[in-house]
Swiss-Prot record:
Disulfide bonds: none
Name used for this protein in its record: Serpentine receptor class beta-18
Compartments in which it is found: Membrane
Source organism per UniProt: Caenorhabditis elegans
Gene: srb-18
Keywords, comma-separated and alphabetical: Membrane, Transmembrane, Transmembrane helix
Positions of transmembrane segments: 52-72, 92-112, 135-155, 172-192, 218-238, 276-296, 303-323
Tree of life domain: Eukaryota
Amino acid sequence: MTSEEIHAAGLCSVVPTIFQNCDNDWISKNGTCYQDSCCMSLETATSWYYRLAQFSHVVFSFMGLIIVVVYILRYRSRHILPENVRVLVDFMLLFIVAHSIDMIVLHIYHIIQSFQANISDPCFVREKVSFCAPFRYTFSFCSMGLAICTYCIYIDRLACAYYKNYTKHQRLILAAQICQLIVISSLIIIWVYRNEEPNTYLLSCLNVPVASVEDMAKATIAVFPINFICFFLSIGLFRHFKKKEEGSRFDIVRHFTASVDVESSEFLFRTTGTQAALMALFSVASLLMRLVYNFLPRQVGLTIATLSYIMSIYCFTVPLVIVKCVQKTSALRKSRISSHVGLKAMGVEGASNYFEMMKSQWE
């Protein structure tokens, strides 16, 4: 059979360029090309660049965990957000933590497996789809959950901006958003993996099973543009709440609420902008990967495919942006307090005492 005939017969996922036999391959069916054999999986898994790509997920995920812990312990109490937004941001952080732990455990396991593998059993580096299910469902649910959570935050902000009885029904709106977040994310993941074949094998649990690739692409196309829509919404909401703040100068309660809404809108603008940029990068990387994959050596293609999953970078970058936003708003708030005290307090000693009392509430 020619290379094209082998590819057309379904014995190779690409037009084969290497014509060798893979001994001790007890997984692949007879006639499978070398590129799809366990021998190629072994060569890929034991290559330094593939291990480095896997380790990059461990590094970014670990740094993301550290930043989330720092935010919770040091900055969360200073981060003034509307109640519903705070709860949904906590869900975002929960998804980031779960995703990061999943990536760390998953890739450390595969790296250890690669060092234990040998040519006498090249299929040792592969894992069953059923074995990978807990890892796959976890990171897929968290990825979808992060996108849907952003959507829920903006529904809440739109309700706050334009629904007159928002304050009265605030908790009901929050409960509806949480239910929507969990149900939609779960249904998407169940639908995507409904046709997976549990007895087939994968080189990495990060890989999507062949039977689910098209459905995952459809789900990604449908869900991730949410970040771009929300980015433009954040601009409109910031302007809306800024006008509301300027119109409430003589009502302390309304002015404080409006100021919190303005700060939260600026915070959402920065985080959503980061998310949109990362999702754009992810889309471009995935598209380029599909275009050039068949023209690359299999080890290089699989390495680039591993790197193109940028959610580990997402789980590092977004918490970092959140912390930077809190630092900026805290510094600005302290500056305003200092200016206010300088104008209102009587006498040097009185100003100093009053400033220290005001300052202590932010430390």
